[in-house]
């Protein structure tokens, strides 16, 4: 089981990525302030669940490779580029178990908003929404019930917050607040929502 909860969903004109801030291991809370949502470039981000050392290493390697790609090709990497590179990185480490992480990639390209979900072995799927981690079943239930095509940004942010709050309230491995990354054609912004947990 991958620790924590992370999710992403599309809306009309953008994407929302979210993750909790708790890091726990072997029954202990190690941190209540870990960032698990990352902006990769102006139009692509990643939300993560798993062991911090693993997803931080993945994000660092990803950012380096994306920067090199953008410099060599003189164009910004798309969400599809980022997701495929992450898939390769995860697949390369599948036998050694290097990366104990699940990720949601979200962003915008010329064809509109995109959400991709990746498992620890590099499996890659494009979805309208997805949740990963120990609270994924709870968050997915909320997303399946209330997601609709053509949602506004406000509706999508509210749905992401609701799904994360439900996961945090029922999953002991998730908690201590919600980081949100909203990406539209106008830019991106991060928000933090405090969540009181027992």
Swiss-Prot record:
GO molecular function, one term: endopeptidase activity
Keyword Iron: no
Compartment list: Cytoplasm
Name of the protein this chain belongs to: Proteasome subunit beta 2
Listed InterPro entries: Ntn_hydrolases_N, Pept_T1A_Psome_bsu_arc, Pept_T1A_subB, Proteasome_bsu_CS, Proteasome_sua/b, Proteasome_suB-type
Protein's gene: psmB2
EC number(s) stated in the UniProt entry for this protein: 3.4.25.1
Function: Component of the proteasome core, a large protease complex with broad specificity involved in protein degradation.
Catalysed reaction equations from the record: Cleavage of peptide bonds with very broad specificity
Active-site residue numbers: 5 (nucleophile)
Biological processes per GO annotation: proteasome-mediated ubiquitin-dependent protein catabolic process
One Pfam family of this chain: Proteasome
Enzyme type, top EC level: hydrolase
Transmembrane segments: none
Annotated family: Belongs to the peptidase T1B family.
Chief location bin: cytoplasm
